[in-house]
């Protein structure tokens, strides 16, 4: 199971562990916490909830929010609610934990394969259309493209040095998954340790240049890694220094003549 669902289930388990299998009386539950007015503008009537009820309802919202955020799993929310209620009174679940894990693994595998196929199709369609746009250069047909946003006049990248740069990585939909913008200074990146499309797409890039790379999943992470499977990756790169290795080898003023 992925980390998200482990976290969700762990949270639910923690909440359920606090509850007793004995059914509490409604009067006892009603007495917990001080009554504070709670108004939900989306409800037809104003209602009052105790602090305990507020916490309980908010926990339900947080759980539902996690379910709603999921792009790869589709739960029947009504059945989730029934499962919560049944567990609180110690009723048996339709599956054992082992059966659940096995079934979940099967479902996740099918969802993963479906998502991989969809993303690959989107990537290939994007590259095909993008190749028609002005200024787009194909390094490898249907696999790797770049577009220069700002020309540079300094030294050009050759091979796989450690380059000093700023970058922003995003998906086709514009969602940013990684960036150096949060740093107050550029990062030193050994190109020999990057994905193939990144290093290859930077060849010939000059200091001061800004270019955008469009990388097919075959030259990126494919179906491996933490990103969605077969994602096309888009990197906007501003090259500060083509080879920081050479700069590091130059003696500093204080060391000259020693």
Curated annotation (Swiss-Prot):
<dbReference type="Pfam" id="PF00254">
    <property type="entry name" value="FKBP_C"/>
</dbReference>
<comment type="similarity">
    <text>Belongs to the FKBP-type PPIase family.</text>
</comment>
<dbReference type="InterPro" id="IPR001179">
    <property type="entry name" value="PPIase_FKBP_dom"/>
</dbReference>
<dbReference type="GO" id="GO:0003755">
    <property type="term" value="F:peptidyl-prolyl cis-trans isomerase activity"/>
</dbReference>
<dbReference type="GO" id="GO:0006457">
    <property type="term" value="P:protein folding"/>
</dbReference>
<keyword id="KW-0472">Membrane</keyword>
<dbReference type="Pfam" id="PF01346">
    <property type="entry name" value="FKBP_N"/>
</dbReference>
<comment type="function">
    <text>PPIases accelerate the folding of proteins.</text>
</comment>
<keyword id="KW-0697">Rotamase</keyword>
<dbReference type="InterPro" id="IPR000774">
    <property type="entry name" value="PPIase_FKBP_N"/>
</dbReference>
<keyword id="KW-0413">Isomerase</keyword>
<dbReference type="InterPro" id="IPR036944">
    <property type="entry name" value="PPIase_FKBP_N_sf"/>
</dbReference>
<feature type="domain" description="PPIase FKBP-type">
    <location>
        <begin position="160"/>
        <end position="243"/>
    </location>
</feature>
<protein>
    <recommendedName>
        <fullName>Peptidyl-prolyl cis-trans isomerase Mip</fullName>
        <ecNumber>5.2.1.8</ecNumber>
    </recommendedName>
</protein>
<keyword id="KW-0998">Cell outer membrane</keyword>
<dbReference type="InterPro" id="IPR046357">
    <property type="entry name" value="PPIase_dom_sf"/>
</dbReference>
<dbReference type="GO" id="GO:0009279">
    <property type="term" value="C:cell outer membrane"/>
</dbReference>
<keyword id="KW-0732">Signal</keyword>
<feature type="signal peptide">
    <location>
        <begin position="1"/>
        <end position="15"/>
    </location>
</feature>
